[in-house]
Amino acid sequence: MEKVIVRDLAKKFMWTIVTGDSNSLNRPLTLADTNRPGLELAGYFPDTQTKRLVVLGDKEIGYIEEQMDEISQRRSFEFLTGDNTPCIVIAHGHECPPVLKEIAKRKNFPVFKTEHQTSHAIVSITNYLDECLAESVVIHGELVRVFGVGVLITGKSGMGKSEIALELIKRGHQLVGDDRIDCYKIHDDLVGRTTPMLEGFMELRGVEEGRIDRKRLELSIYRMFKIVRKFNELRK
C-alpha cells in the first residue's frame, strides 16, 4: 500500500487549486471512495465517512445556489472542511461557492476545480486510489498473458521459470514481467505488473539480460532462443 497525499492527486489530474497552500496539500488519503455530500448539504451529518474526498457536481452546486441560505451553507461547509477530510473537488468547471471559499481559506483547506464531468472525475479518482491503496505483495516469478488471461509462474530459483515463459512468448503470448512481480488486490481482483525498471526485460541462466522489443517481438525472441539453444548445446 502506497502513501497517497492530496498533492499526488492534484498533480495526477492537473486540478486547478482554489484554496490551500503547499502545506495543505500534504493531507493523506486513506480511502478510495468519494463522497457526494447530498445529506450533508441538507444538514444531516451522522454516519458521514469524513475521511473520503468530497466531490461537488452539478446537483450539489445547483442545490447550494438555489436552496441553501448563508447560515445553512456555513454549517455544512464547516463540517465538510474538517480535519479528517482530504480535500474538496468541484467538477464540471463550476465556480467555488463564495461561502465555501471563505471558510476554506480561513482553515487553509484544499479546494480544487476540474473541467471534467462529475462521473468522469469520480471514476478517475476512485480507480487511481484503488490501485495506490491496494494491498500488495512482491512475488518471485514470471507473469505471462496467455490467451488474454494472466498466468503467474512461481517456483524455486533455478527451476526454469524464465525458460517456460520464453516458450510461451515464442508461441505468441505476451510477457508481463520477469523475476519480480508486484501483485495487488483491488476489490476481489488480483492484478500483477512488473516494476518500470524491469519492464520488457528477461533474464535467463547463462545468458545476459535481454530486452524484449515489442515492435520486433518475433525477431527478438528468435534471436534469444537461438542463443539459449546454442548455450544449452555447449553445456552438453
Specify the residue positions occupied by each region the protein language model found.
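Charged, amphipathic alpha-helical linker segments immediately N-terminal to NTP-binding catalytic cores
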Residues: 84-87, 93-128
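Conserved nucleotide-sensing/catalytic segment adjacent to the nucleotide-binding pocket
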Residues: 177-233
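Structural motif
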Residues: 52-55, 86-89, 109-112, 150-152, ...
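Glycine-rich phosphate-binding P-loop
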Residues: 148-176
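Gly/Thr-rich phosphate-binding loop signature of adenosyl cofactor/nucleotide-binding cores
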Residues: 1-81
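P-loop NTPase nucleotide-binding/switch module
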Residues: 128-148
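Short, basic, glycine/proline-bearing loop/turn elements
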Residues: 57-65, 84-87, 200-205
